[in-house]
Amino acid sequence: MFVNQRTRRPYMSVFVLVLGAAVICPAYGIIDRLVVQTSSGPIRGRSTMVQGREVHVFNGVPFAKPPVDSLRFKKPVPAEPWHGVLDATRLPPSCIQERYEYFPGFAGEEMWNPNTNVSEDCLYLNIWVPTKTRLRHGRGLNFGSNDYFQDDDDFQRQHQSKGGLAMLVWIYGGGFMSGTSTLDIYNAEILAAVGNVIVASMQYRVGAFGFLYLAPYINGYEEDAPGNMGMWDQALAIRWLKENAKAFGGDPDLITLFGESAGGSSVSLHLLSPVTRGLSKRGILQSGTLNAPWSHMTAEKALQIAEGLIDDCNCNLTMLKESPSTVMQCMRNVDAKTISVQQWNSYSGILGFPSAPTIDGVFMTADPMTMLREANLEGIDILVGSNRDEGTYFLLYDFIDYFEKDAATSLPRDKFLEIMNTIFNKASEPEREAIIFQYTGWESGNDGYQNQHQVGRAVGDHFFICPTNEFALGLTERGASVHYYYFTHRTSTSLWGEWMGVLHGDEVEYIFGQPMNASLQYRQRERDLSRRMVLSVSEFARTGNPALEGEHWPLYTRENPIFFIFNAEGEDDLRGEKYGRGPMATSCAFWNDFLPRLRAWSVPSKSPCNLLEQMSIASVSSTMPIVVMVVLVLIPLCAWWWAIKKNKTPPHPQVILETRAFMH
């Protein structure tokens, strides 16, 4: 026996090398269909039958050297080529991270925790390749039955380019602090089989291991802790997949990046970054875009967090300026578990994760909207989307003393105000008052359950839906073709309380085809919805348009911000329509248009009443929600400002609340 030092996997020496040559060399008269010759070396996967179709699966394919010892906190280094056939039949380790254990034994939480051992040696790929078994075209599918296949070549001819199959590359979420491609929910066998696409996923470093930023202290960007190492991991994985697409029967020009939450944000950065721009011309952004408040950070903030971690790890922060190499050697000697735990000391409240893509001037050259405004996205296709109740999951975790997982909570008005002020504590007082105005349930009086619902709405709108809308519109204005979906289906098998609605991440299982797994207890309509979403995503990967045969799915534009509704019942609370505008048009007009104008009034000498003059007639007429906000928010603020100007005691914020209530 010998051990491959790169993979640490044992092999029989001479016998396996000879057999490895035989299975891939026609001269021996033996062809092993499960062996693929990659640029790094040959790999052997496994075969599985899925939905009546054979899929070849390759797990644990290394694309980088293990980022351990001297490579900790550095950009990834490509994997050394190996000799002999690498065993690619086992799931790889997950990158170092902490588990969520707020609800021990609860499957709804456990499904997102790593299901393989965590390790710093974690930079591996997973790849699913459908064989040429023929899948019926979506146009002919009999929804409501399990007869998905037909014995002809139509589907294969229509859904494979001359260069090969389209490839979907998955990037997992987890707030850049957690996540792993090995989760059961990310098993892409069904997506590959039903969609007739190659699917790949990668591991990338999260937390401080992937985002520690000390560039100002280090001479030369290639040195320790340049920041964004996790993004460089993703970039190297994408390049490896593009280089090896043909080896798996794929088309290197038909690579679509798709991801959820932090994964969606990552996709949006790859489309804009000078490092990765051009590697893919299509992206799917699920509940995450780069401009979201949690999705990026300034170099100054990242540096402050890094300094705090060094101090918490007892690595003599005072020496960082004069001897950064000494400090970094200390950090490399710190136990990985210690770093993994101590980094959470910098968590700053709801969605205030201490790691995120950093504006380093190299991978991320400017703030997200500036990068977007400077981009030329002609020829880029985007599918973007949100879920109806994005905020409830995070609300529960950050305010676990207020809410229960299983049952709705009647939240008194004083607790509503307390939570809202805590969530938006970095906003100015006028901004916080405006936010409270916007999310007070005026129609329902002092309804505690409505208060809980409105706090969840505020979190979802601010951190997810409205940044997504803003980014989607920015993409269209830079030349991209954008389609928008809105996922509104509450899954019948959901383990979370009814009050939590359609949670952040609920669409993932449908896109990966999990409801089509007969062993799981989904309803037939949910299986149909999943199949429909799988086909839309696959069609988008091939053509850039998610619409199926005979279906109209309009482009998303500022003039017509139309989204397509994904719901198993074929209808939604939006009057049973398949389409809507927005989503959350009024709330997002507040966050994306009104609040920035209010924020511009940053000093007492500047009247908020001037905001009326700043708003063009065209702007106000095209967004009626702004008019409502002017009446319900700006007029009371004007009164407050005039009171200050006349040296009178300004009205208490509660008086302003009562003013709006009266006006309403």
Swiss-Prot record:
<feature type="lipid moiety-binding region" description="GPI-anchor amidated asparagine">
    <location>
        <position position="647"/>
    </location>
</feature>
<keyword id="KW-0732">Signal</keyword>
<feature type="glycosylation site" description="N-linked (GlcNAc...) asparagine">
    <location>
        <position position="117"/>
    </location>
</feature>
<keyword id="KW-1003">Cell membrane</keyword>
<keyword id="KW-0719">Serine esterase</keyword>
<protein>
    <recommendedName>
        <fullName>Acetylcholinesterase</fullName>
        <ecNumber>3.1.1.7</ecNumber>
    </recommendedName>
</protein>
<keyword id="KW-0325">Glycoprotein</keyword>
<feature type="glycosylation site" description="N-linked (GlcNAc...) asparagine">
    <location>
        <position position="517"/>
    </location>
</feature>
<feature type="active site" description="Charge relay system">
    <location>
        <position position="504"/>
    </location>
</feature>
<keyword id="KW-1015">Disulfide bond</keyword>
<comment type="similarity">
    <text>Belongs to the type-B carboxylesterase/lipase family.</text>
</comment>
<dbReference type="Pfam" id="PF00135">
    <property type="entry name" value="COesterase"/>
</dbReference>
<dbReference type="InterPro" id="IPR001445">
    <property type="entry name" value="Acylcholinesterase_insect"/>
</dbReference>
<keyword id="KW-0472">Membrane</keyword>
<comment type="function">
    <text>Rapidly hydrolyzes choline released into the synapse. It can hydrolyze butyrylthiocholine.</text>
</comment>
<keyword id="KW-0770">Synapse</keyword>
<feature type="disulfide bond">
    <location>
        <begin position="466"/>
        <end position="588"/>
    </location>
</feature>
<feature type="disulfide bond">
    <location>
        <begin position="315"/>
        <end position="330"/>
    </location>
</feature>
<dbReference type="GO" id="GO:0045202">
    <property type="term" value="C:synapse"/>
</dbReference>
<feature type="active site" description="Charge relay system">
    <location>
        <position position="390"/>
    </location>
</feature>
<dbReference type="GO" id="GO:0003990">
    <property type="term" value="F:acetylcholinesterase activity"/>
</dbReference>
<dbReference type="InterPro" id="IPR019826">
    <property type="entry name" value="Carboxylesterase_B_AS"/>
</dbReference>
<keyword id="KW-0531">Neurotransmitter degradation</keyword>
<keyword id="KW-0449">Lipoprotein</keyword>
<dbReference type="InterPro" id="IPR050654">
    <property type="entry name" value="AChE-related_enzymes"/>
</dbReference>
<comment type="subunit">
    <text>Homodimer; disulfide-linked.</text>
</comment>
<keyword id="KW-0378">Hydrolase</keyword>
<dbReference type="GO" id="GO:0043083">
    <property type="term" value="C:synaptic cleft"/>
</dbReference>
<feature type="disulfide bond">
    <location>
        <begin position="95"/>
        <end position="122"/>
    </location>
</feature>
<dbReference type="GO" id="GO:0005886">
    <property type="term" value="C:plasma membrane"/>
</dbReference>
<keyword id="KW-0336">GPI-anchor</keyword>
<feature type="glycosylation site" description="N-linked (GlcNAc...) asparagine">
    <location>
        <position position="316"/>
    </location>
</feature>
<dbReference type="GO" id="GO:0098552">
    <property type="term" value="C:side of membrane"/>
</dbReference>
<dbReference type="InterPro" id="IPR000997">
    <property type="entry name" value="Cholinesterase"/>
</dbReference>
<feature type="signal peptide">
    <location>
        <begin position="1"/>
        <end position="29"/>
    </location>
</feature>
<dbReference type="InterPro" id="IPR019819">
    <property type="entry name" value="Carboxylesterase_B_CS"/>
</dbReference>
<dbReference type="InterPro" id="IPR002018">
    <property type="entry name" value="CarbesteraseB"/>
</dbReference>
<feature type="propeptide" description="Removed in mature form">
    <location>
        <begin position="648"/>
        <end position="664"/>
    </location>
</feature>
<dbReference type="GO" id="GO:0019695">
    <property type="term" value="P:choline metabolic process"/>
</dbReference>
<feature type="active site" description="Acyl-ester intermediate">
    <location>
        <position position="261"/>
    </location>
</feature>
<dbReference type="GO" id="GO:0005615">
    <property type="term" value="C:extracellular space"/>
</dbReference>
<dbReference type="InterPro" id="IPR029058">
    <property type="entry name" value="AB_hydrolase_fold"/>
</dbReference>
